[in-house]
UniProtKB/Swiss-Prot annotation:
UniProt protein name: Mitochondrial carrier protein SCaMC-3L
Keywords recorded for this protein, A-Z: Membrane, Mitochondrion, Mitochondrion inner membrane, Repeat, Transmembrane, Transmembrane helix, Transport
Membrane-related topology note: Multi-pass membrane protein
Solcar repeats (start-end): 90-176, 184-269, 280-367
Pfam family, one: Mito_carr
InterPro entries hit by this protein: Mit_carrier, Mitochondrial_sb/sol_carrier, Mt_carrier_dom_sf
Superkingdom of the source species: Eukaryota
Compartment list: Mitochondrion inner membrane
GO MF term list: ADP transmembrane transporter activity; ATP transmembrane transporter activity
Parts of the chain that traverse the membrane: 96-113, 151-170, 194-207, 245-263, 282-306, 342-361
Gene this chain is encoded by: SLC25A41
UniProt organism field: Homo sapiens
Length: 370
């Protein structure tokens, strides 16, 4: 049978009608469902990079959060992001003063543990084992109760240059990497932080040597800081002020890597726990940074012990020490456990040092009106 004359036209009109109906349905149809939101991101208020405490990242900018803090574990003084982002000079000095005061009070409060750590690192051995209580008793018997704070004066004194150098060097590195505005990416923040720590440790290494000698001094050995420096220069020369520099620099690597790895692990744990990511408490931030810093200290502790032994070598044996020689001597006489002498007071002082510095820093900010 042939097609009817009007059939092609009817077919075209039907197709056009069908398209119009489909178009109408598409316009009236509800929008497609949105993809599920990404998992909540870590926001502890303090993204931590070796030597610094950063505010969390949001759209490549650093947000100022109330939980940002200074943290002094007795080994590393963290610089909070609010100090790094301040433009007003008056406010900047207030932040720096708050951080310096927090570090001074923290180190003074934990000075007996710090001296016990150095004492055990230098004098404890298999044949002359010294535990924490025994070390404290020996120090009190030799010099009285006040002797527990020997070396604390210079330990507090070096806070100001250490803090200022870290701040200044990081600012220069940040401006070099990404200009005056914006925040550098993670890798460049890590590099900037490590450079600042390395430079600050280079400049204050003589103060570290003086601190070790003054901490270990016997009653009447030195009249004070200047007399200690004079005797070292006269008997051992200027090179003695940089003893322990190499293990100190090498210790940055395991410290920083372990510190960041543990912090990232805590970050993942916090995200997977499904808790409120928007506003964790200051205690969570403080605990995370303290734990990661403690693990970093444990990873670099053998190098820290070698550094201390090299700095105190004149006090112990009167020879010119090398890193290799000190390490071989420790392993031969005490074994691998000898590389962790003094770890107990080191761990015991982390939590009180961090807590004291946090409380004092916040109190100083309120007092100074910032």
């Amino acid at each position: 049978m042939g097609a009817q004359p009007g059939e092609p036209q009817n077919t075209c009109s039907r197709i056009q009608t069908l398209f119009r109906r489909v178009k109408t349905l598409l316009i009236k149809a509800p929008p497609p469902p949105q993809p599920p939101p990404p998992p909540p991101s870590w926001n502890p208020g303090c993204t931590h990079v070796y030597g610094y405490a950063f505010g969390h990242m949001h759209d490549n900018n650093l947000e100022h959060l109330p939980s940002q803090q200074v943290l002094d574990t007795g080994e590393q003084l963290m610089v909070p992001v609010e100090v790094l982002e301040v433009d007003n000079k008056e406010a900047l000095w207030k932040f720096l003063l708050s951080g310096a005061m927090a570090g001074a009070v923290s180190r003074t409060g934990t000075a007996p543990l710090d001296r016990a750590k150095v004492y055990m690192q230098v004098y404890s051995s298999k044949t002359n084992f010294t535990n924490l209580l025994g070390g404290l008793q020996s120090m009190v018997q030799e010099g009285g109760f006040r002797s527990l704070w020997r070396g604390n004066g210079i330990n507090v004194l070096k806070i100001a240059p250490e803090y200022a150098i870290k701040f200044s060097v990081f600012e220069q590195c940040k401006n070099y990497f990404c200009g005056i505005q914006g925040s550098p990416p993670f890798q460049e923040r890590l590099l900037a932080g490590s450079l600042a720590v390395a430079i600050s440790q280079t400049l204050i290494n003589p103060m570290e040597v003086l601190k070790t000698r003054l901490t270990l001094r016997r009653t009447g050995q030195y009249k004070g800081l200047l007399d200690c420096a004079r005797q070292i220069l006269q008997r051992e020369g200027t090179r003695a002020l940089y003893r322990g520099y190499l293990p100190n620099m090498l210790g940055i690597i395991p410290y920083a890597c372990t510190d960041l790895a543990v912090y990232e692990m805590l970050q993942c744990f916090w995200v997977k726990s499904g808790r409120d990511m928007g506003d964790p408490s200051g205690l969570v931030s403080l605990s995370s940074v303290t734990l990661s810093t403690t693990c970093g200290q444990m990873a670099s502790y053998p190098l820290t012990l070698v550094r201390t032994r090299m700095q105190a070598q004149d006090t112990v044996e009167g020879s010119n020490p090398t890193m290799r020689g000190v390490l071989q001597r420790i392993l031969a006489q005490q074994g691998w456990l000898g590389l962790y002498r003094g770890m107990t007071p080191t761990l015991l002082k982390v939590l009180p040092a961090g807590g004291i510095s946090y409380v004092v820093y916040e109190a100083m900010k309120k007092t100074l009106g910032i």
